[in-house]
């Protein structure tokens, strides 16, 4: 039903120097439809998830990440 959690060591990277321009890292937290993955799948803590969500939304507004992927 759900794909396996990412559970990578990206939590430390989120705390330090993650930026809305780091699209390659932020794309790990977005599914194939362009939706932001929930905490139960990413394995991030609450503050980290809020920061990632905020950065993804900033990247979408800056046109670095798409709002919707593959809508036909």
Curated annotation (Swiss-Prot):
What is the protein name given in its UniProt record?
Answer: Small ribosomal subunit protein bS18c
Name the PROSITE patterns for this protein. RIBOSOMAL_S18
Q: Which InterPro entries match?
A: Ribosomal_bS18, Ribosomal_bS18_CS, Ribosomal_bS18_sf
**Signal peptide range:** none
Per UniProt, subunit arrangement is: Part of the 30S ribosomal subunit.
Domain of life, per lineage: Eukaryota
Provide the GO MF annotations for this entry: small ribosomal subunit rRNA binding; structural constituent of ribosome
Tell me the Gene3D superfamilies matching this sequence. Answer: Ribosomal protein S18 (4.10.640.10)
Tell me what organism the protein belongs to: Emiliania huxleyi (Coccolithophore)
Q: Which HAMAP family match?
A: Ribosomal_bS18
The Gene Ontology biological process terms listed for this entry are: translation
């Amino acid at each position: 039903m759900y794909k396996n959690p990412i559970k990578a060591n990206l939590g430390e990277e989120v705390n330090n120097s993650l930026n809305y321009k780091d699209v390659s890292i932020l794309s790990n937290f977005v599914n194939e439809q362009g939706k932001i993955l929930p905490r139960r799948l990413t394995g991030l803590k609450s503050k980290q998830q809020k920061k990632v969500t905020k950065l993804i939304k900033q990247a979408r507004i800056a046109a670095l990440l798409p709002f919707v992927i593959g809508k036909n």
